[in-house]
From Swiss-Prot:
Residues 1-31 are annotated as: Disordered. The gene is rpsK. Gene3D superfamilies: Ribosomal protein S11 (3.30.420.80). One of its GO terms (molecular function) is rRNA binding. PANTHER family: 40S RIBOSOMAL PROTEIN S14/30S RIBOSOMAL PROTEIN S11. It comes from Mycolicibacterium gilvum (strain PYR-GCK). This is Small ribosomal subunit protein uS11. Disulfide bonds: none annotated. One of its GO terms (cellular component) is ribosome. Located on the platform of the 30S subunit, it bridges several disparate RNA helices of the 16S rRNA. Forms part of the Shine-Dalgarno cleft in the 70S ribosome.
Protein backbone atom coordinates (compact mmCIF):
# COMPACT_ATOMS: atom_id res chain seq x y z
CA UNK A 1 0.00 0.00 0.00
CA UNK A 2 1.49 3.34 -1.06
CA UNK A 3 1.78 6.11 1.51
CA UNK A 4 0.61 9.62 0.77
CA UNK A 5 3.37 12.16 0.28
CA UNK A 6 3.77 14.72 3.00
CA UNK A 7 4.60 18.28 2.11
CA UNK A 8 2.60 19.92 -0.65
CA UNK A 9 -1.19 19.98 -0.10
CA UNK A 10 -3.59 18.46 -2.60
CA UNK A 11 -5.22 20.66 -5.22
CA UNK A 12 -8.11 22.68 -3.85
CA UNK A 13 -7.10 22.08 -0.23
CA UNK A 14 -6.69 25.09 2.04
CA UNK A 15 -3.38 25.51 3.81
CA UNK A 16 -2.94 27.21 7.14
CA UNK A 17 0.41 28.93 7.35
CA UNK A 18 1.50 30.21 10.75
CA UNK A 19 1.67 33.98 10.41
CA UNK A 20 4.34 35.93 12.26
CA UNK A 21 2.73 38.16 14.85
CA UNK A 22 4.47 41.25 16.16
CA UNK A 23 3.80 41.22 19.91
CA UNK A 24 6.37 43.21 21.93
CA UNK A 25 4.84 42.45 25.35
CA UNK A 26 3.39 39.10 26.46
CA UNK A 27 2.79 36.80 29.40
CA UNK A 28 4.70 33.63 30.25
CA UNK A 29 2.61 30.98 31.99
CA UNK A 30 4.72 28.30 33.70
CA UNK A 31 2.82 25.23 34.91
CA UNK A 32 5.16 23.13 37.01
CA UNK A 33 3.76 19.83 38.26
CA UNK A 34 5.52 16.96 39.98
CA UNK A 35 5.79 15.16 36.61
CA UNK A 36 6.33 17.85 33.97
CA UNK A 37 6.84 21.57 33.30
CA UNK A 38 4.87 23.40 30.60
CA UNK A 39 5.83 26.93 29.48
CA UNK A 40 3.32 28.90 27.37
CA UNK A 41 3.98 32.43 26.14
CA UNK A 42 0.84 34.37 25.24
CA UNK A 43 -0.10 37.79 23.93
CA UNK A 44 -1.94 40.19 26.30
CA UNK A 45 -5.31 38.72 25.23
CA UNK A 46 -4.23 35.21 26.22
CA UNK A 47 -3.70 33.71 22.75
CA UNK A 48 -0.74 31.31 22.80
CA UNK A 49 2.21 32.48 20.68
CA UNK A 50 4.75 29.81 21.67
CA UNK A 51 4.87 26.85 24.02
CA UNK A 52 7.22 24.09 25.09
CA UNK A 53 7.27 21.38 27.74
CA UNK A 54 9.84 19.09 29.27
CA UNK A 55 8.39 16.17 27.31
CA UNK A 56 8.28 18.18 24.07
CA UNK A 57 11.98 19.04 24.45
CA UNK A 58 12.86 15.33 24.53
CA UNK A 59 12.81 14.13 28.13
CA UNK A 60 10.88 11.03 29.15
CA UNK A 61 9.71 9.59 32.44
CA UNK A 62 11.09 10.95 35.69
CA UNK A 63 13.62 13.18 33.88
CA UNK A 64 10.75 15.44 32.75
CA UNK A 65 10.33 16.68 36.32
CA UNK A 66 13.93 17.91 36.72
CA UNK A 67 14.89 21.60 36.85
CA UNK A 68 17.22 21.10 33.86
CA UNK A 69 14.30 19.89 31.72
CA UNK A 70 12.30 22.96 32.78
CA UNK A 71 15.26 25.17 31.83
CA UNK A 72 15.44 23.73 28.30
CA UNK A 73 11.66 23.99 27.87
CA UNK A 74 11.69 27.67 28.89
CA UNK A 75 14.62 28.45 26.56
CA UNK A 76 12.82 26.70 23.69
CA UNK A 77 9.58 28.64 24.28
CA UNK A 78 11.49 31.94 24.62
CA UNK A 79 13.32 31.35 21.33
CA UNK A 80 10.03 30.69 19.51
CA UNK A 81 8.40 33.75 21.10
CA UNK A 82 11.28 36.04 20.12
CA UNK A 83 10.62 35.11 16.48
CA UNK A 84 7.21 36.76 16.95
CA UNK A 85 8.79 39.91 18.37
CA UNK A 86 8.25 39.30 22.10
CA UNK A 87 10.73 41.28 24.19
CA UNK A 88 9.10 41.65 27.62
CA UNK A 89 6.97 39.16 29.58
CA UNK A 90 5.09 39.03 32.85
CA UNK A 91 5.49 35.60 34.47
CA UNK A 92 2.65 33.61 36.05
CA UNK A 93 3.78 30.47 37.88
CA UNK A 94 1.37 27.68 38.76
CA UNK A 95 2.02 24.42 40.62
CA UNK A 96 4.39 22.88 43.16
CA UNK A 97 7.03 21.41 40.81
CA UNK A 98 10.80 21.66 40.96
CA UNK A 99 11.22 23.64 37.72
CA UNK A 100 9.61 26.91 38.78
CA UNK A 101 12.60 29.15 39.54
CA UNK A 102 14.81 27.54 36.91
CA UNK A 103 12.28 28.28 34.17
CA UNK A 104 12.05 31.95 35.19
CA UNK A 105 15.85 32.30 35.24
CA UNK A 106 16.22 30.71 31.82
CA UNK A 107 13.57 33.05 30.35
CA UNK A 108 15.76 35.95 31.50
CA UNK A 109 18.92 34.27 30.20
CA UNK A 110 17.30 33.73 26.79
CA UNK A 111 16.95 37.50 26.37
CA UNK A 112 13.38 38.17 27.50
CA UNK A 113 12.90 41.03 29.95
CA UNK A 114 10.89 39.72 32.92
CA UNK A 115 8.46 42.23 34.43
CA UNK A 116 6.14 41.06 37.19
CA UNK A 117 6.27 37.56 38.67
CA UNK A 118 3.05 36.20 40.17
CA UNK A 119 2.22 32.86 41.79
CA UNK A 120 -1.22 31.78 40.59
CA UNK A 121 -1.24 28.30 42.13
CA UNK A 122 -4.87 27.37 42.82
CA UNK A 123 -5.57 26.91 46.53
CA UNK A 124 -8.60 24.78 47.44
CA UNK A 125 -11.04 26.04 50.07
CA UNK A 126 -11.23 22.40 51.18
CA UNK A 127 -12.33 21.04 47.82
CA UNK A 128 -11.37 17.60 46.52
CA UNK A 129 -9.88 14.91 48.73
CA UNK A 130 -6.10 14.70 48.13
CA UNK A 131 -4.44 11.45 47.00
CA UNK A 132 -3.46 8.95 49.67
CA UNK A 133 -0.05 9.21 51.33
CA UNK A 134 2.75 7.22 49.66
CA UNK A 135 4.18 4.31 51.63
CA UNK A 136 7.62 3.41 50.33
Amino acid sequence: MAQAKKGAPKKGQKTRRREKKNVPHGAAHIKSTFNNTIVSITDPQGNVIAWASSGHVGFKGSRKSTPFAAQLAAENAARKAQEHGVKKVDVFVKGPGSGRETAIRSLQAAGLEVGAIADVTPQPHNGCRPPKRRRV
